[in-house]
């Protein structure tokens, strides 16, 4: 994660330009202690790469600014201190603390300087957590005092492309692109096209998830049908085995012989009649087969000998 934070901080440094002691960024009175602390913090960040010391120096500068009267110079110093502090936190892989650290001094999101808010949006969107700064950016854009600032349009576009679209807030992105005067006609068309593509992609992903969830259900249904069919076949096999064993049992054969004798007695069948010879011959052969099958099961070794 350290490498990710380092790479995330590298492009962010170009937003306001590197702060070096040899190149004073602001024309500030030499008597202001916050100026010296700002220069010291920028040296620690850029030259010495001592990020922890740079962050502590920024915090000391903020404490000294509490006694300074509010002026345009102080506003610029506060903004520069926030930039240095955010970059130091990102380099230490503590980028998640950047927004809360800034709000500790500005109290409310609407009072954030545009450059500081832009830096936070780029940082959190690059680290794949746009939702962390989404509410802060929305509150800043809805404030009437901020809508007349020169940087309002660029922040509105960043809000759409870097925060709302990755977070899936397509309706809010569309409403902002259509109603906001910060978008030119070309920028509005570009934003609406991006929203349309994101909506199509979201629909495709939802359809794919639905089909993926239906697939296990189909497999379960097919498995249940196969299990029922297998159970039915096993039941039929057991029934068939029971019928066969019943037919081959000794009591059944005795009952069949008794029924045959009873039938002969009832029909008064004459065994001495010439017409009965074929029937008697077939009956004798049947009895011999039954006897042979019975004896072969009882005395298999004797029959082989």
From Swiss-Prot:
Keywords: Membrane, Peroxisome, Protein transport, Signal-anchor, Transmembrane, Transmembrane helix, Transport
Gene Ontology, cellular component aspect: peroxisomal membrane
Peroxisomal matrix side: 268-305
UniProt GO BP: protein import into peroxisome matrix; protein import into peroxisome membrane; protein to membrane docking
Name of the gene encoding the protein in the UniProt record: Pex26
Subunit structure: Interacts (via its cytoplasmic domain) with PEX6; interaction is direct and is ATP-dependent. Interacts with PEX1; interaction is indirect and is mediated via interaction with PEX6.
Domain of life: Eukaryota
Species whose genome carries this gene: Mus musculus (Mouse)
GO molecular function, one term: ATPase binding
Membrane topology reported for the UniProt record: Single-pass type II membrane protein
Disulphide bonds in the chain: none
Stretches assigned to the Cytoplasmic side: 1-246
A Pfam family that the UniProt record links to this protein: Pex26
Summary of the function given for this chain in its UniProt record: Peroxisomal docking factor that anchors PEX1 and PEX6 to peroxisome membranes. PEX26 is therefore required for the formation of the PEX1-PEX6 AAA ATPase complex, a complex that mediates the extraction of the PEX5 receptor from peroxisomal membrane.
InterPro entries documented for this protein: Pex26
Name of the protein in its database record: Peroxisome assembly protein 26
Family statement: Belongs to the peroxin-26 family.
Location of the protein in the cell: Peroxisome membrane
Transmembrane segments: 247-267
């Amino acid at each position: 994660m350290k490498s990710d934070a380092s790479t995330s901080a590298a492009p962010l440094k170009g937003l306001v330009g590197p702060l070096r002691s040899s190149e004073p960024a602001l024309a500030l009175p030499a008597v202001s202690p916050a100026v010296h602390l700002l220069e010291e913090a920028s040296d620690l960040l850029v030259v010495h790469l001592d990020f922890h010391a740079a962050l502590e120096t920024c915090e000391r500068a903020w404490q000294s600014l509490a006694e300074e009267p509010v002026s345009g110079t102080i506003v610029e110093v506060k903004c520069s201190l926030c930039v240095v502090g955010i970059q130091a936190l990102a380099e230490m892989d503590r980028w998640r603390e950047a927004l809360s650290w800034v709000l500790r001094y500005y109290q409310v999101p609407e009072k954030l300087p545009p450059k500081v808010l832009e830096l936070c949006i780029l940082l959190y969107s690059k680290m794949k957590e746009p939702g962390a700064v989404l509410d802060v950016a929305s509150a800043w854009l809805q404030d009437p005092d901020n809508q007349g600032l020169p940087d309002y349009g660029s922040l509105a576009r960043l809000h759409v492309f870097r925060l709302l679209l990755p977070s899936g807030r397509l309706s809010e992105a569309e409403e902002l692109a259509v109603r906001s005067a910060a978008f030119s006609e070309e920028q509005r068309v570009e934003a609406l096209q991006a929203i349309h593509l994101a909506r199509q992609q979201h629909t495709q992903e939802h359809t794919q998830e639905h089909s993926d969830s239906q697939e296990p259900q189909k497999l379960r249904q097919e498995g249940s049908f196969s299990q029922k069919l297998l159970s039915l076949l096993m039941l039929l096999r057991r029934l068939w085995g029971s019928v066969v064993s019943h037919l081959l049992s000794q009591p059944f054969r005795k009952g069949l012989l008794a029924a045959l004798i009873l039938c002969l007695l009832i029909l008064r069948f004459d065994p001495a009649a010439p017409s009965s010879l074929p029937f008697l011959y077939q009956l004798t052969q049947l009895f011999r087969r039954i006897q042979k099958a019975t004896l072969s099961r009882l005395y298999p070794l004797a029959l082989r000998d």
